[in-house]
């Protein structure tokens, strides 16, 4: 089993999120990468599209920390189980939620990503409730 700190996903979460390095997005993601579960189908792909999400999230939260609990790596795929913690800027509430990310690696960069994060749990921690559609 690979050392977690040697994996691309660990580097991604550490550089991009924990060290708040927007330039690392260009370094670690291809120009045409998709990011399911994060980017809408009509948003730009790749680093430029991800930067939209990155900056929107950073505008709403600060002191963002992503702990990489485990990484499984096989061939050109990596999958990570993570815990995100942050402070909601508007309310000052501390939040924490779990998530998983799987990526396909192309030439040493993220070429495609599938994300599954507990955004419902995040919204509940902020006091938001889902209402039925009428």
Where are these regions (language model features)?
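Short, cysteine-centered beta-strand-loop-beta hairpins and adjacent loop/turn segments enriched
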Residues: 59, 63, 86-96
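Short, surface-exposed coil-to-beta transition loops
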Residues: 65-66, 81, 95-101
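A short hydrophobic beta-strand element
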Residues: 75-84
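Hydrophobic pocket/interface hotspot
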Residues: 9, 24-26, 33, 50, ...
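Short, low-complexity N-terminal intrinsically disordered segments enriched in polar/charged residues
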Residues: 1-31, 130-134
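Residue-level structural signal for beta-strand termini and adjacent loop
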Residues: 100, 115-116
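Low-complexity, intrinsically disordered terminal/linker segments enriched in charged
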Residues: 116-134
């Amino acid at each position: 089993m690979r050392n977690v700190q040697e994996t691309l996903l660990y580097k991604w979460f550490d550089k991009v999120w924990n060290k708040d390095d927007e330039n690392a997005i260009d370094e670690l993601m291809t120009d045409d990468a998709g990011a399911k579960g994060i980017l809408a189908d009509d948003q730009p792909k790749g680093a430029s599209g991800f930067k939209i999400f990155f900056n929107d999230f950073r505008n709403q939260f600060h002191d963002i920390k992503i702990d990489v609990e485990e990484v499984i790596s096989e061939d050109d795929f990596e999958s990570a189980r993570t815990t995100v913690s942050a402070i909601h800027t508007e309310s000052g509430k501390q939040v924490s939620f779990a998530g998983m990310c799987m990526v396909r690696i192309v030439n040493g960069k993220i070429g495609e990503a599938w994300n599954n994060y507990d955004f419902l749990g995040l919204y509940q921690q902020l006091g938001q409730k889902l209402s039925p559609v009428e």
